[in-house]
């Protein structure tokens, strides 16, 4: 194997060409620093996972919120964040707590203007994700905060990629695609470079799984290294090894992947071997509403349904999930409720009226109207009668969908695709009829219907997100639809511990000279800025905030 060597021709080496790496590089280029960006994938994958995202951004007290009559504040947002995070580890959460306060402050002040100055815009309706549903000081967003990027994930990538590519044209940035880092070089207690393998060239499209055939080696040196390599979302072995069984229940036997194959988590162990501290390994953020992509891009490609609150949710035994396990309310509590049955899937039961207004699909490619910034298509697909085209395509082609005119036919279809027990028609009918009877009055005792009524008091939900309450068994609202929901892997909430400048911390609590980390590999900041739970719209923001911190710190410190 040929080995290419390099003297420190760049100020900084960035490992990972995803969003966090691009943001850090952008900040360094603004300061006139030279950067060498390495990634094991090809140039087509510039932007990493962020490209595939819906582009949700967590803003606090934004103009969009105020126009919709939403009263938000730093204090309320921090209350929600800390109530969701539930930081309880003095050592592992030491920096995470500080990152949480700093990030919420960023979201309430600079974040929107920082992105707007780069050309990013958001849609006017603000979404209400992770609504919580328990107590004011517990998990969840008290108010809508999910701002959707006009252009979705590709636009978030674009606003940072364009200035970085301009830096490449100016000679400040070099890319080393198909360069897989296998080792951090440590000399005299400081990180001074990286070693790794050059992988064979490929022209595969973005997101496709690529080969790991080695054709050479490399060694590169710089004044500092930023690790921005992402999490473990497609590495099911690592997920199983770190799964929090005591907290969430048994690890699912069947998991489908919400991120591409290159999201392998390799750099976590490599950085730990070099001397960096990993904290909060057992904290993850996977989704309970995963469906198999009928038109996959990567292996085991999963899409998440981002649901409105009206679908009835049943476990694998056909028992309706209790409060607050309603669609879009409390991801980890619902995960625990599902897994305690001993099965790793659940069911939505809904109507055509609900799917038309309440089903959104995660992913830029599943929202071509917003991704393409096509206002006419957006109005047609979101306002016109019928579900958006991609949702209808899943209803017709998805292996997890059952459509029927009667409940008996629906249950028969559900039982054909069940991976566990056969559902009892009479019991399912009893539960649905009981719920439907509660609609006879404008008030009642069904917690989910109360939550729906609360949601529809918010204009954004009533106008575009929450269906008018109706009986599930009303033929006029049909046909009936059932969706088998799988566990979808996604985010690593723990990771490399970092201080507020994104410098990696060693196990003894001291800063690691020459080593920084940003994005998911650092738990989106500090080794776990979200604690145990996320409020959504915070993952892209965590990459941006931690990447910005790393870039700005090194721009100031390097001479």
Predicted regions and their residues:
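Extreme N-terminal leader/targeting segments of oxidoreductases
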Residues: 1-12, 30, 529, 556-559
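Beta1/beta-strand and adjacent pyrophosphate-binding region of the FAD-binding site
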Residues: 5-20, 36
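Glycine-rich FAD pyrophosphate-binding loop
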Residues: 30-51
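N-terminal glycine-rich dinucleotide-binding loop that anchors FAD/FMN and/or NAD(P) in oxidoreductases
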Residues: 51-81
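Conserved redox-cofactor binding core of oxidoreductases
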Residues: 99-218, 236-239, 291-292, 432-474
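Glycine-rich loop(s) and the adjacent beta-strand/alpha-helix scaffold that form part
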Residues: 202-294, 536, 540-549, 553
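An anion/pyrophosphate-binding glycine-rich loop and adjacent beta-alpha core
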Residues: 268-270, 274-416, 420-423
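A glycine-rich dinucleotide-binding beta-alpha-beta segment and adjacent secondary-structure elements
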Residues: 420-525, 529
């Amino acid at each position: 194997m040929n080995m290419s060597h390099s003297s420190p021709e760049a100020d900084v080496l960035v490992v990972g060409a995803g969003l966090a790496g691009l943001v850090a590089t952008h900040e360094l280029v603004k300061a006139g620093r030279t950067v060498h960006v390495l990634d094991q994938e090809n140039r087509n994958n510039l932007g990493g996972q962020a490209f595939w995202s819906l582009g949700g951004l967590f803003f606090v007290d934004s103009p969009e919120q105020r126009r919709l009559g939403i009263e938000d504040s730093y204090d309320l947002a921090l209350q929600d964040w800390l109530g969701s995070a539930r930081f309880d580890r003095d050592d592992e959460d030491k920096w995470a707590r500080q990152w949480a306060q700093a990030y919420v402050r960023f979201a309430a002040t600079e974040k929107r203007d920082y992105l707007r100055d780069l050309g990013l815009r958001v849609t006017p309706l603000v979404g209400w994700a992770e609504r919580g549903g328990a107590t004011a000081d517990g998990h969840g967003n008290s108010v809508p905060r999910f701002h959707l990027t006009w252009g979705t994930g590709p636009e978030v990538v674009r606003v940072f990629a364009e200035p970085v590519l301009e830096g490449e044209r100016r000679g400040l940035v070099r890319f080393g695609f198909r360069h897989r880092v296998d080792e951090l070089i440590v000399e005299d207690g400081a990180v001074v470079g990286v070693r790794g393998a050059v992988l064979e060239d490929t022209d595969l499209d973005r997101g496709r799984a690529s080969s790991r055939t080695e054709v050479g080696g490399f060694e590169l040196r710089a004044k500092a290294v930023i690790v921005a390599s992402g999490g473990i979302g497609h590495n099911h072995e690592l997920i199983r090894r770190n799964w929090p069984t005591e907290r969430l229940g048994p690890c699912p036997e069947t998991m489908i992947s919400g991120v591409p194959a290159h999201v392998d988590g390799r750099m976590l162990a490599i950085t730990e071997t070099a001397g960096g501290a990993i904290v909060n390994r057992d904290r993850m953020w996977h989704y309970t509403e995963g469906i198999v992509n009928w038109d996959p891009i990567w292996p085991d490609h999963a899409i998440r349904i981002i649901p409105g609150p009206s679908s009835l949710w049943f476990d694998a035994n056909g028992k309706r999930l209790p409060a607050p396990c309603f669609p879009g309310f409390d991801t980890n509590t619902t995960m625990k409720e599902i897994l305690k049955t001993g099965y790793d899937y659940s069911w939505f039961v809904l109507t055509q009226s609900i799917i038309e207004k309440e089903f959104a699909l995660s992913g830029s490619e599943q929202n071509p109207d917003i991704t393409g910034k096509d206002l006419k298509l957006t109005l047609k697909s979101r306002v016109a009668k019928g579900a958006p085209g991609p949702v209808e395509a899943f209803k017709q082609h998805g292996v997890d969908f059952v459509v029927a005119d009667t409940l008996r036919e629906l249950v028969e279809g559900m039982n054909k695709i069940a991976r566990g027990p056969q559902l009892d028609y009479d019991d399912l009918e009893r539960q649905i009829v009981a719920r439907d009877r509660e609609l006879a009055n404008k008030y009642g005792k069904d917690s989910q219907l109360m939550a729906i009524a609360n949601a529809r008091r918010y204009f954004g939900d009533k106008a575009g997100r929450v269906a008018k309450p109706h009986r599930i068994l009303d033929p006029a609202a049909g046909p009936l639809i059932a969706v088998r929901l799988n566990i979808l892997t996604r985010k690593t909430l723990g990771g490399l511990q970092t201080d507020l400048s994104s410098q990696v911390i060693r196990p003894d609590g001291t800063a690691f000279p020459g080593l920084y980390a940003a994005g998911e590999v650092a738990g989106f900041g500090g080794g776990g800025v979200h604690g145990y739970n996320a409020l959504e719209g915070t993952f892209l923001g965590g990459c941006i905030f931690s990447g910005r911190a790393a870039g700005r710190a090194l721009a100031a410190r390097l001479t």
